[in-house]
Amino acid sequence: MLEEDMEVAIKMVVVGNGAVGKSSMIQRYCKGIFTKDYKKTIGVDFLERQIQVNDEDVRLMLWDTAGQEEFDAITKAYYRGAQACVLVFSTTDRESFEAISSWREKVVAEVGDIPTALVQNKIDLLDDSCIKNEEAEGLAKRLKLRFYRTSVKEDLNVSEVFKYLAEKHLQKLKQQITEDPEQTHSSSNKIGVFNASVGSHLGQNSSSLNGGDVINLRPNKQRTKRTRNPFSSCSVP
């Protein structure tokens, strides 16, 4: 375990074409709500949720990035400092599927090879699917990413995506601490550890995340009851 007065904070970016369900996914996970109304994200939005992963308190800071090309310069700037990534495409949007490799390259160019999950959203619309199962699974294998099929509408596998990424980051964090214990106390460290006793971040300052056009909505910390999902994830060995 980490030190008792330390809190892990993980910056996750949710990336993909417009209208694939990125905003809805974050709203569902952080606030437990779903709306059919589509509102284009202007630049970047931000929500957070506090969870426990393997008995560790973890704060997930979820960044919803615009999928339109006109916002590309803005969203790329917000990739910096990200410690995990969700790549999302829609079951009913072939173009969003074909764009995944490009989105992946943009993220890697800014932050390197961080824990990443590939998500096929809107599986409640499988009857209208534009992507074959083997195509989606093949893409995950080529990119060497954990693959999930989700339905934000039905709340299927949404929590599993973020939990997986949190676990992967914690593994990386603990490995870094083992290799260099002093790293968690360095003001230049960027692995996302907060000193809970004084509320200070030892990497990227949380107050700096809320400037400019970012909307900082703090969700109710009430936890929602987990439901058993009939769809399982597909992982790459």
UniProtKB/Swiss-Prot annotation:
PROSITE patterns according to UniProt: RAB
Phenotypic consequence of gene deletion: Complete embryonic lethality, due to defects in neural tube closure. Mice suffer from exencephaly and severe malformations of the spinal cord and the dorsal root ganglia. In addition, mice display poorly developed eyes and polydactyly.
Subcellular location: Cell membrane; Cytoplasm; Endosome membrane; Cytoplasmic vesicle, Autophagosome
Catalysed conversion reaction: GTP + H2O = GDP + phosphate + H(+)
One record GO biological process: autophagosome assembly
Region of interest (Disordered), residue spans: 204-237
Annotated family: Belongs to the small GTPase superfamily. Rab family.
Subunit structure: Interacts with SUFU.
NCBIfam families from the UniProt entry: small_GTP
Protein name, per record: Ras-related protein Rab-23
